[in-house]
């Protein structure tokens, strides 16, 4: 079809460029043994999900409707995080999501039993894997503190002071998301701050999710720095590593 024949308005996607980016992400998965998830709030053109699913491990969502989209259109690993969940939404999320991440221990306590019993209502008969979002209180962003998850008075994630080791039973993963269109050196800085405060708990976990904001496919991205960090984590702690790039 010629450009002049396209119905307008419409979205036009360069499949070759998308595949080039996906190949970079797939190589990272294969070389380092990590898992890449599509952050749907950044890119949710579901007509491309079957193609994207050929290269990466799955999707991550910020609520029920994105979770449905990933479950129905890609059908691979399906993760979700939200600052708070409605009980009605949680009843469906435990059926369609593999990982559910809570913003606080209060939210986890509220839905712990529902997650624990989730195998009874899931097609795969496997219980949901539960995670807690962490605020490592390490800001690497400048100029827009109001949007910074580690900024003053942020309520995104659990700080070291708020962490409840006594409530870790049933928690299988930790998650932090602090970056926005940033390079690997900022991720290293963030992880080092996280490790200093929370690293001891990783020995009790099955996975670590380092969120999104990684410009992995950008030309000047420090890919070798990222690989070195992932290898260090996997060699030091008994956890699977997840990343959630969106724009990349």
Tell what function each PLM region has.
Residues 34-207, 229-232, 237:
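Active-site-proximal beta-alpha core segment in soluble small-molecule metabolic enzymes
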């Amino acid at each position: 079809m010629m450009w002049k024949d396209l119905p307008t308005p419409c979205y036009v996607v360069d499949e070759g460029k998308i595949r080039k980016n996906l190949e970079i992400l797939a190589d990272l998965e294969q070389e380092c043994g990590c898992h890449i998830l599509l952050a749907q709030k950044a890119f949710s053109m579901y007509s491309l999900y079957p193609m994207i699913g050929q290269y990466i491990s799955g999707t991550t969502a910020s609520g029920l409707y994105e979770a449905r989209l990933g479950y129905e259109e890609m059908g691979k690993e399906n993760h979700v995080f939200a600052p708070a969940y409605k009980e009605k939404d949680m009843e469906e999320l435990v059926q369609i999501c593999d990982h559910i991440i809570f913003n606080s221990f209060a939210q986890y306590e509220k839905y712990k039993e529902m997650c624990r019993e989730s195998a009874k209502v899931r097609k795969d008969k496997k219980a949901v894997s539960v995670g807690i979002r962490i605020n490592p209180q390490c800001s690497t962003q400048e100029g827009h503190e109001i949007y910074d998850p580690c900024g003053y008075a942020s309520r995104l994630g659990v700080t070291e002071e708020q962490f409840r080791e006594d409530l870790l039973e049933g928690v299988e993963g930790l998650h932090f998301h602090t970056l926005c269109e940033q390079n690997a050196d900022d991720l290293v800085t963030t992880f080092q701050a996280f490790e200093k405060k929370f690293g001891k708990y990783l020995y009790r976990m099955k996975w670590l999710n380092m969120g999104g904001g990684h410009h992995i496919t950008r030309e000047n991205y420090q890919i070798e720095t990222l690989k070195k960090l992932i290898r260090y984590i996997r060699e030091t702690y008994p956890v699977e590593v997840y990343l959630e790039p969106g724009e990349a």
